[in-house]
């Protein structure tokens, strides 16, 4: 029957326990509350209102004299119904605030509540980007301080603060490289070298900027060799885009030699900073020969991801690329802080002006600086150390029941492949779906592409040993269950979610973005009579 004929929601309570080192640990994960919820349109209660305001005296004062020709079709509900509806929906979400979030290459760390308190201070939370600069001196000083920290940590002389996320930062860096090459009179350099293990945004960004992508194969050890890079170099190479540590969770030991070879050939070195959390406070990208690198504040510096976002991806730049940084930027003069917003005031080459309508993600700037100041330099070094330690603890604890993709230790994330599932009939997707019933968001699947059936786990530094042991116990339990031949268990997973396995291909290719009110018997009769 249509969901509108059912109760608005149904609640099921479940719990789960796992055995960890001989002790039974009660672990509810994200399974404590599961429910079916009607659409907000299906909860429509004609005549209900949230706030009752006086009607305007004349129609001319309403919508500037305009009047709608037909009802918009928005549902009518009282405020408690709206609050309860969206609260119930939120309880079906998985979030870092509920359980460990092992999504590889995403650095899903805890978002400290102190950062949230700072971001809500009136001097930061209640300002507007179009205010006169003399009224937002504190905000401009904060941007300047954060920029100083990012330059100091990376060893880079300049930073563009406005990019809105990681891929947006890539776009900023590639546009700066494009402009620098044009200024050198070398517009023929339009080939970008990208390792096959790179994030998919790297080749996409290069292509979007008008470059041709040339793929560098990975070595058997998961790394990029300087010999493979040299074989691709030529006078048409614009840059190389390299992630370090790479998406296999491994440090690139020849990165300086690679940078020197690219520079000698006339190209630039763009470093994808997605995995900067593994080296923050310990490695300065400038010392590796980097010309441009985006920094994901929503990863390394703990600002919220996704729906809790937005993201923020400042880009640090070398001396060679600094003149091509986008507007705006903050300067400190004798009269305080000022915001340079126009090319005529910049005194630099500004070939593409702005990347965003305003000045960057101010709320994320506040949170990131609060995080940095809370930790200090020593604390940030501890962050990277603990992130690497936690990943290696998982790798060492699971490699006897799951198949590690490479020999030796990892950096910030542990990479496994599907060899341990061979002969079981269980796929990496089945394994990941079964994790949901155990209270965990799945790890990253089938990425990086250089590993068959990849399962990429990144615990970050904020998880305790107890939490890691619970996760390890669950992974061992599932691996042993798969090897024991319980194929039906995996193919039926997840069982405990309101929705089971969705047709993700159809959802992506044929999304239903508009709710259509179901036909009533009366309207059906009218339509039949018209026919």
Q: Residue ranges of each PLM-predicted region?
A:
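Short, small-residue-biased leader/transition segments that mark boundaries at the very start
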Residues: 1-12
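Non-catalytic terminal extensions of PLP-dependent enzymes
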Residues: 13-158, 283, 333-355, 359, ...
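Short His-Asn-centered micro-motif
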Residues: 80, 162, 194-195
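Conserved PLP-enzyme active-site core in the AAT-like
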Residues: 138, 168-338, 350, 425-426, ...
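Long, K/E/R/D-enriched contiguous segments that form extended
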Residues: 144-148, 154-157, 162-173, 177
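General small-molecule cofactor/ligand-binding pocket signal
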Residues: 160, 214-216, 443
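Short strand-loop junctions, especially beta-strand C-caps/beta-turns
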Residues: 164, 219, 243-245, 417-419, ...
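Short glycine/serine- and small hydrophobic-enriched flexible loop segments
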Residues: 175-179, 369-374
